[in-house]
Amino acid sequence: MLKPLGDRVVVQLKEEKEQTVGGFVLAGASQEKTKKAQVVAVGEGVRTLTGELVASSLVQGDTILIENHVGTPVKDDGKDCLIIREADVLAVVND
């Protein structure tokens, strides 16, 4: 299992259903510019200039919303994941 450093977060993308309109699959450019992911692991947080640790506001299991272009793809226990910075998280989704 990966242990992210600092403000980094390991996430696994959630499968999204294909968007259709009247039975036609929408082209990639027409689809959402965001995607949902589940938090797999969270770094310890970041340090301020005075050395104080500011912990992450995310916890393992959170469902989050991120932009399509963020993250570094990695494999974790054979699963496709992304490593992102906490600042790249747009929102926490309450299911």
UniProtKB/Swiss-Prot annotation:
S-S bridge residues: none
GO terms assigned for molecular function: ATP binding; metal ion binding; protein folding chaperone; protein-folding chaperone binding; unfolded protein binding
Subcellular localization: Cytoplasm
Chief localisation class: cytoplasm
InterPro entries hit by this protein: Chaperonin_GroES (IPR020818), Chaperonin_GroES_sf (IPR037124), Chaprnonin_Cpn10_CS (IPR018369), GroES-like_sf (IPR011032)
Gene Ontology cellular component terms for the protein in this record: cytoplasm
Record keywords: Chaperone, Cytoplasm
One GO term (biological process): chaperone cofactor-dependent protein refolding
SMART domains, sorted: Cpn10
Keyword match Ribonucleoprotein: no
PANTHER family, sorted: 10 KDA HEAT SHOCK PROTEIN (PTHR10772), CO-CHAPERONIN GROES (PTHR10772:SF58)
Family: Belongs to the GroES chaperonin family.
Role description: Together with the chaperonin GroEL, plays an essential role in assisting protein folding. The GroEL-GroES system forms a nano-cage that allows encapsulation of the non-native substrate proteins and provides a physical environment optimized to promote and accelerate protein folding. GroES binds to the apical surface of the GroEL ring, thereby capping the opening of the GroEL channel.
Subunit structure comment from the entry: Heptamer of 7 subunits arranged in a ring. Interacts with the chaperonin GroEL.
Name this protein carries in UniProt: Co-chaperonin GroES
